[in-house]
Curated annotation (Swiss-Prot):
Protein's recorded name: Methanol:N,N-dimethyl-4-nitrosoaniline oxidoreductase
Assembly information from the UniProt record: Homodecamer.
Species per Swiss-Prot/TrEMBL record: Rhodococcus erythropolis
GN (gene name): thcE
Cofactor(s) required for function per UniProt: Mg(2+); Zn(2+); NADPH
Superkingdom assignment: Bacteria
Reactions accelerated catalytically: methanol + A = formaldehyde + AH2
Enzyme Commission code: 1.1.99.37
InterPro entries, sorted: ADH_Fe/GldA (IPR001670), ADH_Fe_C (IPR056798), Alcohol_dehydrogenase_Fe (IPR039697), NDMA_methanol_DH (IPR026338)
Protein task: Catalyzes the oxidation of methanol to yield formaldehyde. While the in vivo electron acceptor is not known, N,N-dimethyl-4-nitrosoaniline (NDMA) can serve this function in vitro and is reduced to 4-(hydroxylamino)-N,N-dimethylaniline.
Regulation: induction: Expressed during degradation of thiocarbamates and atrazine.
Family indicated by similarity: Belongs to the iron-containing alcohol dehydrogenase family.
Length: 423
């Protein structure tokens, strides 16, 4: 298990760089020019199930118009798997590509980051690169990341997340932190978010909320991250409902775009916590959507963490729109939890994991066999609750959590997230 005190043992914190980014309405129009200017000749385009939305076809046209050849890998799955990464890296080598473009959300971007690492290390298995700065060869292929969701912020961070499926009796979703995977160019255009379905907009929005709130209360307490962190929470509170229910509301979509990006910058150096640890564990076992997992875990984790960070959660309440002027610090912190629950209810988040059907996710669309035996619902039996709690203990996000975490302390939190209700 990761020692929770290791952060205290290393009080010198590290500020990680951000990539160059093009942000705003119409930014996607110049992807071809940017690819050409970066020297792309034959690029591997990695994406999920976006074919047919019109986005891939439009962007491929803009890229090819500038004389850049495109090789398509469109088999990236939600919660990208180790075999997605290895297949893409092999295709890159077979087709003699010189660059990568990822289009989509965090799954596309993270799979592309993983493929870059594998390519730079002569085809070594991606699962060898879990943890901090495992790359020995930093000369990765150049990478343009184009976002079509406001969620992960992967296009601005040094982190990537991969699911190790080598032992399906003990599936493992791991995090890699490596500056070698920072993208060459990020493109965020709110026009590309218009086709994101309502429920995915909500799920991804809660991913942003987790990315903003966790570094704000993190044990690292990294000052350069705090401003971006809390402002991203404010942007989510102001824009997520409108983005969900008015998908072509440009102001709301742009607000969520900005929230995603600065939340990504916040956790890039400020760290995360057990909202993400729970999410990774549930995804590993059931392949459920990462943002949805965060949404269900978030209020439970906030309640668990409150005693260690009352003042910070009180500030989050203000960012979420709560009038805290006549509240004590503890009352305001409690109100933050209530505001998060209300936001989840408003945008259609299921009340617990037991209400989640996993048969609507990419694993079924891609005909993946790995998760067939898992069923279509998340079951909260004692064995599963303990297995998830043990996975949390070993997650790379857990050391940043403000309150100490043990397997036993997580069991009631996980049990509540699967079997109990807020609404």
């Amino acid at each position: 298990a990761i020692e929770l005190n290791q952060i205290w043992d290393f009080p010198i914190k590290e500020f990680h760089p951000f990539p160059r980014a093009l942000m705003g309405v119409g930014a996607h129009d110049i992807i071809g020019v940017e690819a050409k200017n970066l020297g792309f000749k034959r690029t591997l385009l990695m994406t999920t199930g976006l074919r047919g939305s019109g986005i891939i076809e439009e962007l491929v046209g803009k890229i090819e118009y500038q004389g850049v050849e495109v090789v398509l890998y469109d088999k990236v799955e939600s919660n990208p798997k180790d075999y997605n990464v290895m297949e893409a890296a092999a295709l890159y080598q077979k087709e003699k590509c010189d660059s990568i473009i990822s289009i989509g959300g965090g799954s596309s971007h993270d799979a592309a980051k993983g493929a870059r690492v594998v390519i730079a290390h002569d085809g070594r298995n991606i699962n060898e690169f879990e943890g901090f700065a495992k790359s020995t060869n930093k000369e990765n292929p150049p990478h343009i990341a184009v976002s079509t969701t406001a969620g992960t912020g992967s296009e601005t961070s040094w982190a990537y997340v991969i699911t190790d499926t080598s032992d399906m009796n003990n599936p493992h979703k791991w995090v890699g932190f490596d500056e070698a995977t920072i993208v060459t160019l990020a493109i965020d255009d709110p026009l590309l978010y218009y086709t994101c379905p309502q429920h995915f907009t909500a799920y991804c929005g809660f991913d942003v909320l987790a990315h903003g709130s966790e570094p704000f209360v993190s044990r690292l307490d990294f000052a350069p991250s705090l401003g971006n962190a809390i402002y991203s929470v404010e942007l989510v509170a102001k824009n997520l409902r409108e983005a969900v229910f008015e998908p072509r509301n440009l102001k709301a979509r742009e607000g969520m775009m900005n929230a995603q990006y600065i939340a990504g910058q916040a956790f890039n150096s400020g760290g995360l916590g057990i909202v993400h640890s729970i999410s990774h564990a549930v995804s590993a076992f059931f392949d459920s959507h990462h943002g949805l997992n965060n949404a269900i875990a978030l209020p439970r984790v906030w309640e668990y963490n409150l005693p260690s960070r009352y003042e910070r959660y009180a500030q989050l309440a203000g960012a979420l729109g709560v009038d805290t002027r006549n509240l004590t610090t503890v009352q305001a912190a409690d109100a933050a939890v209530e505001a998060a629950i209300r936001l989840a209810k408003d945008v259609g988040i299921p009340d617990n994991f037991g209400q989640v059907r996993t048969d609507s996710y990419a694993k079924n669309q891609m005909n993946t066999k790995k998760y067939e035996g898992r069923g279509d619902v998340i079951k909260g039996d004692e064995k599963t609750v303990r297995a998830i709690s043990e996975h949390i203990q070993d997650d790379w996000c857990t050391p940043g959590n403000p309150r100490e975490v043990t397997v036993e302390s997580m069991i009631p939190v996980v049990d509540h997230a699967i079997n109990k209700s807020y609404f």
